[in-house]
Amino acid sequence: EALVEQGNEVVVIDTLLRGNKIPKHIFKEVEFHQVDVTDEESVAKISKGADMIFHFAAILGVDIVADNPIETMEIEVNGMQSVAHAATVNQIDKIVYASTSGVYGHLALEKSVDEDILVDPCTSYAMAKRYNEIYLASLHDEKGIQSSAIRFFNVYGPRQDNRMVIPRFFEQAMINDPITVYGSGDQTRDFTNVKDAVKATILLSEKVHGMEIFNVANERESTIGELADVIKSMTNSTSEIHHIDAPKKRYDYEVG
């Protein structure tokens, strides 16, 4: 959406398995292909003539990833291979890749982290994201293709899937259903507004050099319990906040 508004010619590849969330006025301005990112031949054909590839295709959602670990990794790894092939055969020398804060794993629970720390991914999603970061580094060394890998921290905003925590809480609060919180609610997240994430992404796309990794976050932690209270207050909801049990690994960390 932001790229179109800047006057760029944009080509979109998506399976639409979760529906079409592109606004109608923007959809009319893009060239759209309903294609799976793992379809190497199609991705290469469609991306011919492009100056840059933004690779943001992935399976998202903690529960979905937990239930489909192999499929999650296959789509991540094969999707990246497809994008790398397209960049190579079409002589596209820049890739912007959506990685995740999840690569830090338990390390992020214990201390502040930066891009240079030795990471400790704990989910199939985060492991695959880290693999792809390493792959991009080798792609630069071997093929000269430059890239930026962006480790997003819990992005939220309009049109987000309601299986994610913020839209789920809003949905529950607006109909006065119980707001369900896993565990104590003391687990923390660094929530990043999608507008800030977009600004950072576009800025980094203009400064792609070598292979670099960046964190995109707001530097302020909030607990899930605080989030539930804020959303309840914002919506003037009569919802009760229900704390429910979940496996420890489920709520200590989440994909970003």
Regions found by a protein language model. Name each.
Residues 111, 162-170, 252:
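A glycine/serine/threonine-rich, flexible loop-to-helix segment
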Residues 173-256:
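C-terminal substrate-binding subdomain of Rossmann-fold SDR/epimerase-dehydratase oxidoreductases
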Residues 3, 139, 168-172, 200-204:
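A short, amphipathic alpha-helix embedded in the catalytic core of nucleotide-handling enzymes
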Residues 1-155:
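N-terminal Rossmann-like NAD(P)+-binding domain of SDR-like oxidoreductases, especially those catalyzing
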Residues 121-128, 152, 158, 162-166, ...:
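The catalytic Tyr-centered alpha-helix of NAD(P)H-dependent dehydrogenases
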Residues 131, 135-139, 169, 227, ...:
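Hydrophobic alpha-helix immediately C-terminal to the catalytic Tyr-X-X-X-Lys motif of short-chain
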Residues 45, 67, 78, 108, ...:
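Generic recognition of short, well-ordered alpha-helical segments
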